[in-house]
Design a protein with these regions (language model features):
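Non-core capping and flanking segments associated with repeat-based/extracellular domains
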Residues: 1-416
Length: 416
């Protein structure tokens, strides 16, 4: 390849990334097709827009507010085409937030084998525009350090060809900070209204962050090794979430504990579903006051009495609504008699396994098999819990459900 051709290819890569950075890129499923915003719209671009919006006959008569309402319904490629038609259209598109559904920033992922067979320090930024991951409306960039510079790589997919890795060098900057700036630019482009957020970065650079509040965030996953990082993110999300995931470095999972006082946060106490891949210092009182119907955490302080009361609350109709599961992970030697005190237990004997018609085998394959009991509701005897006691977990599942068929009522057992 001649030096002129090499320079042309390098310039094209720079143009591509600049357009990424300014949010003027056309990102399609498995094909990063970059558009030049300074290039005039082609007849094909205009025709596709005409078909979508029914023609331009009255378009110039609309004021900017009306145009913005129309632009809200355009997908990102269509916006890129429209903004090239005129300065007024460019301004209308620029002022209309992009619907960003999910943003992920994760450091030191290890499965980038198309780029390197050896592990390397990196930050991955993923942006998804649609709730369905398989829609293809998403992209992924990988940031890494190259001496004093930052290397940005992404994979370009071309039909009927092998994927190609594209790259760009950003001079004299830190890859970690550049990745965060890029991810936060996409949040800003979506008016900070994405529904989901994943942050798995050991040293998120708070000092350069532009995030003030994420008003519509309903699902967040954060990895941290100190409570202040969790606290920083909690200050920027609503009290009421749909689900919450907190985790720590794998090496610290069995030593570092989320403090008891922090667990009083409404994002934890009110969420209907949470998973903590770390130790959590819940007291019995906090555990009993949780609103979640599906929980999992490494248990430190919850006692046998707390677990016993939790089950009794459900049995008497005072438990959380639509309970699904509670997994308390611990290698502590719990006193089984204290956990089950005052409860009517049905062991998983041959009679139960025959009645449950294959459920026990399915349960063992999916959930593991410790010492299992079925515990029935006093409000509705066709509803029941499964209590499974093993060496590393006290697991409670809502497995028995009232079912009516052909005029008969019975318990149907299934894994929630």
């Amino acid at each position: 390849m001649s030096s002129a051709e090499e320079q042309k290819e390098e310039d094209e890569c720079k143009l591509e990334f600049n357009i990424f950075g300014e949010f003027l890129d056309d990102i399609e499923h498995e094909n990063v097709g970059i558009l030049n915003p300074n290039k005039a719209a082609t007849k094909k671009d205009i025709d596709s827009l005409l078909k979508l919006i029914g023609g331009f006959q009255h378009w110039p008569l609309l004021n900017e507010d009306c145009k913005i309402e129309v632009v809200k319904y355009l997908d990102y490629p269509s916006r890129c085409k429209l903004e090239r038609c005129s300065r007024a259209d460019y301004e209308a598109v620029k002022k209309t937030p992009v619907e960003v559904y999910n943003v992920e920033m994760i450091d030191n992922e290890t499965h980038h084998y198309s780029l390197s067979m050896e592990p390397f320090d990196n930050v991955v930024v993923r942006v998804q525009f649609h709730h369905d991951f398989n829609s293809g409306k998403r992209f992924e960039l990988i940031f890494s350090q190259l001496g004093d510079d930052t290397e940005v790589r992404w994979t370009q997919y071309v039909p009927r060809k092998r994927p190609e890795s594209r790259n760009l060098i950003l001079k004299s900057c830190n890859y970690y900070e550049e990745a965060v700036k890029f991810g936060e630019k996409w949040m800003k482009k979506g008016n900070y209204e994405m529904r989901h957020l994943t942050i798995e970065m050991k040293n998120y650079p708070f000092e350069i962050s532009q995030i003030k509040f994420l008003p519509r965030c309903k699902s967040i996953r954060v990895a941290a090794d100190d409570v202040e990082m969790f606290r920083w993110w909690f200050q920027r999300i609503p009290d009421q979430l749909v689900d919450l995931q907190l985790l720590t470095n794998f090496d610290n999972r069995h030593t570092w504990t989320i403090p008891t006082e922090f667990l009083n946060a409404p994002q934890i106490m009110l969420t209907p579903e949470f998973y903590f891949w770390c130790r959590a210092g819940f007291t019995d009182e906090q555990f009993l006051n949780l609103k979640a119907n599906k929980i999992s955490f490494d248990c430190v302080n919850v006692t046998e009495d707390g677990i016993n009361k939790y089950i009794k609350n459900w049995v008497s109709g005072k438990g959380v609504e639509n309970f699904r599961s509670a997994l308390l992970w611990s290698y502590r030697n719990y006193d089984e008699s204290a956990i089950t005190r005052g409860l009517e237990l049905r062991p998983w004997d041959n009679n139960f396994e025959e009645e449950a018609a294959g459920f026990c085998g399915d349960f063992e394959r999916v959930c593991g098999r410790g010492t299992c009991y079925q515990i029935y509701s006093k409000i509705d005897p066709y509803e029941s819990l499964t209590l499974s006691l093993s060496d590393d977990c006290v697991a409670i599942y809502g497995t028995g459900k009232r079912t009516e068929w052909n005029g008969k009522t019975y318990s149907n057992y299934s894994i929630p």
